[in-house]
């Protein structure tokens, strides 16, 4: 996570749902410039060490040089690491950048309603299902779940 004044921290990898829940519930929103570039640099470094099936990013703004981010997203795409970007809010600059980052990495973009924990849960489930079972498993989950998951799956599997 990142926040405040140039704060960036990466938790250790875990396969424990309990540990992941602990990490995710400890995250708080702080004012400060976005550090998406730091997240992408970290993902690139980690993906060169071991296989990463997907990168998930939840954010509301983008305040960095988009070209630098697009270059790294393209590298992630080449390495087979799709980015799933979930936008909280309706900032048009963030939306444009998040859509482009998703496209360059062969991932997907979806806006969610910040008042709906269920939507975000479904989106995170969809990414986990993709990471374990690939496109076919994601399509199957999308057919059963519908709604926001179907929108995400459509943007992921139907590229222009």
Where are these regions (language model features)?
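Extended, alpha-helix-rich binding/interface surfaces that flank or overlap catalytic cores
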Residues: 52-58, 99, 117, 131, ...
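VWA/integrin I-like adhesion module and closely mimicked acidic/polar interface patches used
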Residues: 61-104
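C-terminal "exit" segments of structured domains
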Residues: 109-160
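Acidic, Ser/Thr-rich peripheral helices and adjacent loops at domain boundaries
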Residues: 15-25, 102-112, 135
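Active-site-proximal beta-strand/loop segments in catalytic clefts of secreted hydrolases
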Residues: 1-3, 58-61, 86-89, 112-114
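Von Willebrand factor
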Residues: 1-12, 16-58, 62-65, 89-99
């Amino acid at each position: 996570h990142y926040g405040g004044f140039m704060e960036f921290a990466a938790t250790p990898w875990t396969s424990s749902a309990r540990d992941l829940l602990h990490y995710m519930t400890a995250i708080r929103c702080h004012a400060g410039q976005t550090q998406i570039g730091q997240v992408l640099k970290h993902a690139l470094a980690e993906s060169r060490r071991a296989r990463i099936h997907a990168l998930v990013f939840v954010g509301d703004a983008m305040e960095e040089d988009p070209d630098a981010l697009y270059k790294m997203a393209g590298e992630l795409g080449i390495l087979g690491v799709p980015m799933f970007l979930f936008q909280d809010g309706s900032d048009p600059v963030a939306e444009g950048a998040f859509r482009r980052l998703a496209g360059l990495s062969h991932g997907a973009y979806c806006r969610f309603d910040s008042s709906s924990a269920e939507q975000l849960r479904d989106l995170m489930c969809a990414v986990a299902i993709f990471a374990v079972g690939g496109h076919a498993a994601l399509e199957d989950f999308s057919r059963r779940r519908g709604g926001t998951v179907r929108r995400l799956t459509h943007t992921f599997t139907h590229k222009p």
